[in-house]
């Protein structure tokens, strides 16, 4: 197969997995992938998953890749809070949650961290256009904050809660405190319910 034929078929997907290729071609020489990677046409994201090098300079491509590199997953926690202006830090790692085991990946698009949550709380996200029409799964700010409090067990005092450094003005405009209290019990974790109550007290929401 010639590279141009391959590109014409799969470019719209953003990245290409062995499984995706197999759904179109019953016979495919996988050595093509190594050859095209060595030639700079493709970028290896992880074992069995490749992206077109053309996408490398596309704004938002790192975010769009997050839910493709490890699925099912959605962007959450620090990355979403930073993008919403809720925390002051510039988050360089793409933080996501998944129902699969915890994992980390690094490639030319960035560093990716995936942490495990229960399947019954794998909700509270939406599909958004992130790069050249490519969709990605992104948590709402409220869900991102709940995931953060659930996955980090050290926010148990007022001082520790202040260390999240939430912008109080943005917080009051973005997240309803009662919404956090209503959603927290679905995690079936009393510690999270307690952290939400503490957060509401500390930040006045």
Feature-to-residue mapping (PLM):
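Short, well-structured alpha-helical interface segments that form or flank functional binding sites
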Residues: 31, 75, 140
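Structural motif detector for alpha-helix initiation sites
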Residues: 3, 18, 77, 141-142
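Hydrophobic/aromatic-lined pockets within catalytic cores
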Residues: 26, 85, 150-154
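Short beta-edge/loop segments at beta->alpha junctions of small alpha/beta modules
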Residues: 1-72, 108
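Short gly/ser-rich loop at a beta-strand->alpha-helix junction or flexible surface loop bordering the NTP-binding
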Residues: 37, 43-52, 62-121
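Hydrophobic alpha-helical interaction segments
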Residues: 125-205
């Amino acid at each position: 197969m010639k590279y141009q034929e391959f590109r014409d078929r799969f470019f719209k997907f953003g990245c290409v997995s062995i499984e995706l290729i197999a759904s179109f071609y019953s016979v495919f020489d996988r050595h093509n992938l190594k050859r095209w990677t060595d030639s700079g046409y493709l970028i290896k994201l992880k074992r069995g998953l490749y992206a077109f090098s053309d996408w490398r300079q596309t704004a938002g491509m790192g975010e769009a890749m997050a839910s493709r590199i490890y699925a099912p997953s959605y962007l959450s926690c620090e990355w979403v809070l930073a993008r919403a202006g809720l925390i002051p830090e510039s988050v360089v790692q793409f933080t996501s949650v998944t129902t699969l085991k915890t994992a980390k990946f690094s490639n030319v698009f960035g560093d990716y961290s995936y942490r495990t949550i229960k399947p019954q709380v794998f909700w509270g996200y939406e599909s958004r256009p992130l790069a050249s029409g490519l969709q990605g799964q992104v948590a709402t700010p409220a869900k991102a904050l709940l995931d953060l409090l659930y996955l980090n067990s050290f926010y148990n005092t007022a001082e520790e809660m202040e260390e999240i450094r939430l912008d109080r003005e943005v917080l009051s405009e973005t997240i309803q405190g009662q919404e956090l209290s209503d959603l927290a019990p679905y995690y079936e974790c009393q510690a999270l319910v307690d952290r939400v109550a503490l957060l509401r007290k500390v930040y006045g929401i």
